[in-house]
């Protein structure tokens, strides 16, 4: 049986990698993937705590987060594709002109 601390350490590492990706990447797709990595890290920690405490509440929360993440993927990719068609780039620095 793997200790819960290993799962939490992996979750923290994945979250940190996602945060680094959000802060350093300039393409919208990579920022989007980094946010998804952060969501999956949160899911891993929820499952780890649910397993440690023997409660199904954490696993239920994971299904809710996965549903929200699927909606985010659909909407986010649609926005990225629309911006790419309009601007011919996915560089987030070039999108500063969308401020209105």
UniProtKB/Swiss-Prot annotation:
GO cellular component, one term: plasma membrane
Known catalytic reactions: a quinone + NADH + 5 H(+)(in) = a quinol + NAD(+) + 4 H(+)(out)
Disulfide cysteine pairs (residue numbers): none
Top EC class for this record: translocase
Protein name (database record): NADH-quinone oxidoreductase subunit K
Function, as annotated: NDH-1 shuttles electrons from NADH, via FMN and iron-sulfur (Fe-S) centers, to quinones in the respiratory chain. The immediate electron acceptor for the enzyme in this species is believed to be a menaquinone. Couples the redox reaction to proton translocation (for every two electrons transferred, four hydrogen ions are translocated across the cytoplasmic membrane), and thus conserves the redox energy in a proton gradient.
GO BP: ATP synthesis coupled electron transport
Transmembrane regions listed in the UniProt entry: 2-22, 29-49, 63-83
Pfam family, one: Oxidored_q2
Keywords linked to the UniProt accession: Cell membrane, Membrane, NAD, Quinone, Translocase, Transmembrane, Transmembrane helix, Transport
InterPro entries noted in UniProt: NADH_UbQ_OxRdtase_chain4L/K, NUOK/Mnh_C1-like
